Amino acid sequence: LSGDLKAVFKDRGDDSQYHPAELFYFLGQKKVSIPLKIKTRGNFRKSASNCKYPPLMLNFPNSEVMDNTLFSGQNKMKLVTPCQGDEYTVNEYLVYKLYNLFSPQSFQGQLLKISFQDTLKRKKARTYYGLLLENENQMAQRNQALLFEKIGYQPTQLDKVKFLEMAVFE
């Protein structure tokens, strides 16, 4: 992931903005490049006092540049970045996989190695484990469900078993 990452990682307010970036990956020997926009997201991990690298929202372009890429058909995806180090990121990935065994109404995650390269610095890229999460709309569609934006549901308003399954993993 390449761009003015210093500006991105400093933009941690409630109203963080999208910044231009470029995502590179290798498909065999071929280097694939996708221009995109990224911004910080989250709550606890978004704070600089808690995490050096805040979680990111990846906003992919809706264009032919996405055709025949690993991210074809994607719009926005959440990227969990290393907060407490690689071990915690790998453990979080395993928790997602465990939750997937309990319920299909859970997010699919993909563990990956991610390198951060700030285009304004001449430092070597740093590589960490990251976790890419499926889009909310994809999870809802996969489960023939609808998304609701309401915040503050009471446990008594929800399916008891599903709520308790979720609570174990929250």
Regions found by a protein language model. Name each.
Residues 1-170:
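Phosphate/dinucleotide-binding and metal-coordinating scaffold of catalytic cores
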